[in-house]
Structures are given as C-alpha cells and as structure tokens.
C-alpha cells in the first residue's frame, strides 16, 4: 500500500485527538499565514498610501468576497467529496472529482474576471465608493481581477491537498505566499512607487509562484489524487455534488458581499469615508481569528468526512467535540485582545488619529460576543464536512444574512454609526442558539445510530 493510501486509512484508525492535531495545526498555520498575508497588505497600504486608501480597499471587500465565494464553493465542495470518497475506498471517483474541480476553477475564475472588469466602475460605485475612494478601489481591483483565475486555482489546490492527506504541503503553500507577498508588497509600494496597485500585484505574483509548486505536487503519480488523462471532462453528477456541498461556503461569502454593501452604504451615510475605513480595519482584526477557526474546520473536514463515510460515528462525534473546544478558545482569545488592545490594533494600520478613534469603537463593539462565533463556525463546518449542505447553508445564512441584515437595517436609524457596529453581536447571539439546537439534534441521532449499527 502506498503512503498516501496508508495516510488516508489512518483517518479511521489513529487516535482522534492526535489526528486532529496532525491535520488542524498545519491548516491553522496555513490560515493564520493567509490572514497575516491579508492583514500585512492592509498595513502596507494604510501606512504607505494613506487613510483614504484603506477606505478604498474596504470598498473592494464585497467584490473580493464574491470572487472568494466561487473559489470556496469549488474548493470546499471538491475537497469534502474527495474525503468522503476516500473513506469509501472509491479512489477512481476521488480522482475524477479532482479533475472536475480543476476545470471548474479555471472556467469560473476567468468568467468572473471578464464580467467584473467590464462593469468595474459601476460595481464599485454600487459597493459604496465615493469620488475620493474610487481611484484606489479601481486600481487595486483591476490587477486583482486580472489574476483571479490564479487565486481560484491556488486556494482550490490547497483545499484538495488537505483532503489528499497532505496538510503540511497545504500549510507550506500558505506560508510561502505570505513570505513572498511580505517581501514584494513593500518593494512595490515604496521604492517602486506603485501604490495600492503594487500591493495587488505582489499578491498575484506570490500566488502564481506557489501555484506552480502545488501543480508539481499533483503531477506526482504517488499522490493519492493526481493529474492524469480522462478526469477533466465535467461529469454532471460530480459537478452537482461539488456544488451541493460547496453551496454553504459560497453562501457564506456571497452573503458577506451583500452585507458589506449595506454596511458600506450605512457607514458612508452616517460616518463618511473614514467610517468605511474603520470597518475595513475591524474586519482585518476579526479576520485573523475567523481564519484560524477555518483552519480548525479544515483540519476536521477530512477526519469527519472519512468517518462519516465509514459510519464510524463515535470517532465523528469525538472530532466534533475537540474542534468545538478549540474553536471557542480561539475566538475567546480574539475577544480579549479586542476589548483590551483596540487602540494598538487600529494603530497598526494608520497614523490618522481620527481613523484610529473610529476604529477603536468599531473593534470593541463588533467583537463583543466573539466567543460565540467559534461555536457557530464549528457547527457549520461539521455539517458541511458530512455533506449536510442544507443545514450548513442555513447556519451560514443565519449569522451573516437572516439575523444580521435586519439588525443592520434597523439599528443605525436609532444609534447611527454605533448601530452598524451593534448589528454583529446581536446576530452572533441568535445564530449561536440556532446552531446549538440543530447540532444537539444530530448528535443524538449519531449516538443512536452508533448504538444500533445503522446509518444516518
């Protein structure tokens, strides 16, 4: 038996705690690296291009999230399908899923770029760009969209690396992009005077370089899923499965796009361009801990998917317990930092005291109930990892749309800018309750099925 298949079989035999550490730590390191890579870009832009550049960058968030929605949908959908098929020992179908995911990433990445570039100015205006911030937002997005297919491929291949029992390779890919971006971005912004566009170019170059390394890994026949003839032609039932499972992360990112549009418009109306910039800074701070939690979830995905496919529900529930505990601890650390070091966090991004003051308030209020977010994310990830797409999508929508948007539409009428900040903690509390109710119901089902030897 080759090493890849042996590593895959360990998903059903190795102690769950050690296994989660083995998969989650590299994923956490990778996601931490990705969040730092995202944050350092903003720091370089804020310190090198000014407060309005930070606001211009914040205006691009909806479009970036929409692009990420398609990439996440394909990447997570494909990696979950691959994990389940490997658990069922169906290696041929796992490879076919890999090939179809590769094709989807290329098609969607290119199509999204073309459509967005054709209507870029109206899109950015709709997303909240003012006369002052539009030039920054446009300069950044023209370059980002030109390399969008590269970004799709990079993130998609990383998700599949984890499903193919190569979490360390996925971690290294993320770390390498951070290092390359951290080297190139300040060079492009300061010595080469390329401004915010230089930061975007550094990102694309870093991703392209590491994508070449990822493709080399998948060119090795020893990898449990690898490039070969006959796996790229789209197969309808495989595409449907990828989309069905990937609809949850797609919905999460797409909802972020919708919500951020409303946030930007509310902040522009009640607080101006600097309030939009403060939201951008707050987003980056929270994003670090959200991404670390996503790393926990990604560590859980192959373990939960494999054991669900193998009907080993005792191991399935154990990985859920460990993931939930870790997720809550992570977001609790984020909450402590937000409540005690908000000034220092804001100061990283800008020297503009007005922007710092607005950002302080935003960080404290927005992250008021942040520990609950960890539990909600772990629940969503669990349902996603076992292919319960509808429940996972419901939980994704509940936090970012169903509860958040009504609060966002109502509260600013009474509390102005503070109302925008308050909408998030209120939504977090309600969505946490919904997640725990659904999770408790399914935990009981799995325990009963384990005792009776039946399938869920």
Q: Whereabouts are the PLM-identified features?
A:
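Helix-terminus/linker motif at the lipid-water interface of multi-pass membrane proteins
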Residues: 36-55, 124-131, 187-193, 254-284, ...
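Short runs within selected transmembrane alpha-helices of multi-pass transporters and secretion channels
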Residues: 75, 144-162, 170-181, 199-212, ...
């Amino acid at each position: 038996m080759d090493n890849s298949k042996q590593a895959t079989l360990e998903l059903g035999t190795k102690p769950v705690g050690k296994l989660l550490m083995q998969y989650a730590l590299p994923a956490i390191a990778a996601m931490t690296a990705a969040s730092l890579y995202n944050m350092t870009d903003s720091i370089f832009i804020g310190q090198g291009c000014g407060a309005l550049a930070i606001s211009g960058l914040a205006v691009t968030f909806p479009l970036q999230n929409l692009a990420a929605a398609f990439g996440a949908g394909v990447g997570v959908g494909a990696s979950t399908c691959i994990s389940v098929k490997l658990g069922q020992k169906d290696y041929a179908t796992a490879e076919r899923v890999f090939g179809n995911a590769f094709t989807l990433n290329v098609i969607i990445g290119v199509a999204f770029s073309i459509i967005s570039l054709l209507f870029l100015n109206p899109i950015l205006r709709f997303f909240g760009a003012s006369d002052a911030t539009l030039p920054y937002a446009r300069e950044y997005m023209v370059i980002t969209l030109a390399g969008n297919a590269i970004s799709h491929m990079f993130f998609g291949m990383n998700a599949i690396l984890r499903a193919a029992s190569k979490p360390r390779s996925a971690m290294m890919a993320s770390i390498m992009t951070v290092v390359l971006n951290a080297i190139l971005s300040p060079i492009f912004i300061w010595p080469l005077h390329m401004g915010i566009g230089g930061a975007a170019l550094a990102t694309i170059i870093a991703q392209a370089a590491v994508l070449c390394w990822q493709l080399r890994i998948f060119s090795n026949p020893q990898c449990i899923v690898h490039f070969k003839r006959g796996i790229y032609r789209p197969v309808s039932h495989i595409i449907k499965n990828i989309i069905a499972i990937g609809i949850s992360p797609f919905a999460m990112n797409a909802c972020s796009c919708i919500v951020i549009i409303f946030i930007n418009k509310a902040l522009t109306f009640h607080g101006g361009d600097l309030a939009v910039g403060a939201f951008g800074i707050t987003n980056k701070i929270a994003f670090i801990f959200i991404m670390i939690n996503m790393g926990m979830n990604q560590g859980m995905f192959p373990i939960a998917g494999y054991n669900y496919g193998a009907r080993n529900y005792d191991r399935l529930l154990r990985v859920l317990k460990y993931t939930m505990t870790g997720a809550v601890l992570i977001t609790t650390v984020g909450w402590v930092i937000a409540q005690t070091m908000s000034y220092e966090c804001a100061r990283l991004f800008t020297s503009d005291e007005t922007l710092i003051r607005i950002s302080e308030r935003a960080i404290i209020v927005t992250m008021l109930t942040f520990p609950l977010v960890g539990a909600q994310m772990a629940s969503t990830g669990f349902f996603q990892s076992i292919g319960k797409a509808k429940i996972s999508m419901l939980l994704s929508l509940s936090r970012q749309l169903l509860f958040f948007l009504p609060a966002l539409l109502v509260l600013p009428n009474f509390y102005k800018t503070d109302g925008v900040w308050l909408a998030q903690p209120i939504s977090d509390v309600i969505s946490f309750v919904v997640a725990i109710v659904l999770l408790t119901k399914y935990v009981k089902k799995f325990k009963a099925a384990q005792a009776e030897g039946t399938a869920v």
